[in-house]
Amino acid sequence: MLLSCSIFRLFCIILLLQLGSIYTKDFTALCSTCRQLVDDFDKGLEKTAKQNFGGGNTAWEERKLSKYETSEIRLTEILEGLCQSSNFECSHMLEENEEHLEAWWFKRKTKHPDLFKWFCIETIKVCCPKGSFGPDCNTCIGGADRPCHGNGKCDGDGTRAGNGKCSCDEGYDGEFCLDCSDGYFNSLRNDTFFLCKECHESCVGCSGGTNQHCKECRNGWVKDQEGSCIDINECIKDPAPCSDDQYCLNTDGSFSCKACDIRCTGCKGDGASSCLNCADGYKDEEGTCTDIDECTEDPASCSDNQHCLNTDGSFSCEEKVPAFNSEGAKTGDSPEKHEDL
């Protein structure tokens, strides 16, 4: 019996948590829908503000336009253009609250020109003023003007949802977003602002923005005699960090190994001009490894009954095959096949 009661209580708690989640999501969506509805209403106002009767009588048009400006006809035109047919949430909100919009149009507009504030916040109460949250529109941490002290986002800000907790921007931490995250330091603090800036890339923790303000150095950096974190040049270490067919490229805090050019046997950098020695099939010409044209060498690289074809770093020999004309007379030789050497 006790076990059954415990299970029932647990079920109730889970159900309440789920309902709370749905409630929050509903109010966030409702506020968004209301905001969109008001935005569309404002667009309708702009669109209908320039109605042209085209009668040619300016005085007559001014009288008609003056009447049209606050008329039921104009309101109807605006309402008909509010919600797209596929937007069920907007259509449902409009259907339930059309009388409120009519009341604002005919009785409240002059005294309450801000439709969003009057309709979404004060009348149907699905939104809150900026800088407040929740069912009672409580003020966010840090105040309505600068929620989370301007360094984060207040949960539920501007809606009847949320718990008001701060989600701090990058570089900021703490319940009130008044602390700097790891890797950042406080560069400005007064009654109005609290500013965090990123540490120098060489630092693990810092008190300022240069490599002289590091508490510790990151891997790949080391402190010099003056206490500044400087890059370690891994490329000058012995033994070398890269293989014989690679060259070392030092970077800030690290290094990388790059493949040598195909014309090189060992290298100290990129390209054929950085070779330590030239690979087979290449020769050094004024400090750059270039292709050897084996087909021009003496003695010849191919036999007398072969054609020589030079390639980059190598060559091939093609067998000569007798060629004949249409009358059967021999006209010369043509290549038959390739033999890579």
UniProtKB/Swiss-Prot annotation:
Glycosylation-annotated residues: N190
Disulfide bonds, paired cysteine numbers: C140-C154, C148-C166, C168-C177
UniProt entry keywords in alphabetical sequence: Calcium, Disulfide bond, EGF-like domain, Endoplasmic reticulum, Glycoprotein, Repeat, Secreted, Signal
Compartments where found: Secreted; Endoplasmic reticulum
Signal sequence region: 1-24
Each FU repeat, start to end: 193-248, 254-308
Chief localization: secreted
Residue ranges constituting the EGF-like domain according to the UniProt record: 136-178, 291-317
SMART domains registered for this protein in UniProt: EGF_CA, FU
Any single GO CC term annotated in Swiss-Prot or TrEMBL for this entry: extracellular region
Molecular-function GO terms, alphabetical: calcium ion binding
Alphabetical list of InterPro entries matching this protein: DUF3456, EGF-like_Ca-bd_dom, EGF-like_dom, EGF_Ca-bd_CS, Furin_repeat, Growth_fac_rcpt_cys_sf, LE_dom, NOTCH1_EGF-like
Domain of life where this protein originates: Eukaryota
Record's function text: Possible role in neuronal acetylcholine receptor transport.
Family statement drawn from the similarity comment of this UniProt entry: Belongs to the CRELD family.
Protein name: Cysteine-rich with EGF-like domain protein 2
Source organism of this protein record: Danio rerio (Zebrafish)
Protein's gene: creld2
